UniProtKB/Swiss-Prot annotation:
Residues 157-186 are annotated as: Disordered. This is Fibroblast growth factor 18. Pfam families: FGF. Glycans are attached at residues 39, 137. The keyword Transmembrane helix does not apply. The keyword Ion transport does not apply. GO terms for biological process: anatomical structure morphogenesis; angiogenesis; cell population proliferation; cell-cell signaling; chondrocyte development; endochondral ossification; ERK1 and ERK2 cascade; fibroblast growth factor receptor signaling pathway. Plays an important role in the regulation of cell proliferation, cell differentiation and cell migration. Required for normal ossification and bone development. Stimulates hepatic and intestinal proliferation. InterPro entries: Fibroblast_GF_fam, IL1/FGF. GO terms for cellular component: cytoplasm; extracellular region; extracellular space; nucleolus. It comes from Homo sapiens (Human). It is found in: Secreted. Interacts with FGFR3 and FGFR4.
Length: 207
């Protein structure tokens, strides 16, 4: 003969159902938040204050620095070369940047063919890159418009086309370096010498 479930069994079933619903809601919120962060990282931010930095980008492959030579881009610049000094503007709260040559005032951009070019106007999304800090402490720059295409150079300092690049290739790995002659950006640690204060001896007066 069939017996009705006890009140305790019903409560347990309701509790398990409630726990399952909570887990589903938390999972959906986590997914939505990740999507929100990814969208914000890829989107332009015209509200936040932009941060401007000056440094060089040392190419792991060529052993030289990225140069913005007007419309031509290379990675053959020596340390301190005027064409290797880059003004880097943070474009969003995430890690999007625009890179401009300080000397030529041309922007580093990647066109639809994946070729690195210099442009006088950097407002196009082709001139925006997503900055990725890798596990080996190098930095990679992925095109914000053409996902999966990276800034890269050959051993001779020639630009590689975006479709032929991958994040794990040494060709797309760079190290940030401050330009020569800018000690205010790389002040060495200075030790301060502290001398022990000598005890003052009071003069004695005859009674």
């Amino acid at each position: 003969m069939y017996s009705a479930p006890s009140a305790c069994t019903c409560l347990c079933l309701h509790f398990l159902l409630l726990c399952f619903q909570v887990q589903v809601l938390v999972a959906e919120e986590n997914v939505d938040f990740r999507i929100h962060v990814e969208n914000q990282t890829r989107a332009r931010d015209d509200v936040s204050r932009k941060q401007l930095r000056l440094y060089q980008l040392y190419s792991r492959t060529s052993g030289k620095h990225i140069q913005v030579l007007g419309r031509r881009i290379s990675a053959r610049g020596e340390d301190g070369d005027k064409y290797a000094q880059l003004l880097v503007e943070t474009d969003t709260f995430g890690s999007q940047v625009r890179i401009k040559g300080k000397e030529t005032e041309f922007y580093l951009c990647m066109n639809r063919k994946g070729k690195l070019v210099g442009k006088p106007d950097g407002t196009s999304k082709e001139c925006v890159f997503i900055e990725k800090v890798l596990e080996n402490n190098y930095t990679a720059l992925m095109s914000a418009k053409y996902s999966g295409w990276y800034v890269g150079f050959t051993k001779k300092g020639r630009p590689r086309k975006g479709p032929k690049t991958r994040e794990n290739q040494q060709d797309v790995h760079f190290m940030k370096r401050y330009p020569k002659g800018q000690p205010e950006l790389q002040k060495p640690f200075k030790y301060t010498t502290v001398t022990k204060r000598s005890r003052r001896i009071r003069p004695t007066h005859p009674a």
